[in-house]
Amino acid sequence: YKSKIKMESFASLIKNRRSTRKFTDQLLSPEQVEMILKAALMAPASKRKNPWQFIVVEDKEMLKKLAGCKAAGSSFLEGCALAVVVLANVMESDVWVEDASIASIYMQLQAEDLGLGSCWCQIRNRQTEDDTDANTYVRNLLDIPYQLEVLSIIGFGYKDQERKPFDEAHLQWEKIHLDSFKMPEENKEA
């Protein structure tokens, strides 16, 4: 079997996918939304338990409310075309954080492949401006049952800003170790 997909396309995808926090008013097509959600549902999960659930939010009033889910770093949700709230059942899997994270990035990579922008809004272990737990805030807004935890909210839309691709000159190769962990020479104690 020989894959017809060129590896250059994936390398280009990960180099060009950057967080987008400014979106146009253009809505996503149903086909685009379906492709993004399919990517999430195809994501690998430990023991194929698939502990994740997804809430798709297109309602502008709800997006505005969700934008208040954190003290900082969530205001972009008000301007996105739609957001996907990423949940996971903590009773189904002890690695729900990892499984839901993989599904989240699959959606973001699919969006980039479609020419769309996205941005991850971390919810787990974060607080609102009045110090309410962000998970509790989102849970109350969307009537989320107790066994589900909110990991993140991913905002999607057409990009209203262009960002340069990731500069490979900034790759931190010093964080790669061969065969065992090795301290950089300048950090070793004598």
Question: Could you say what each language-model-derived stretch is?
Answer:
Residues S3-A190:
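Acidic, surface-exposed loops and disordered segments
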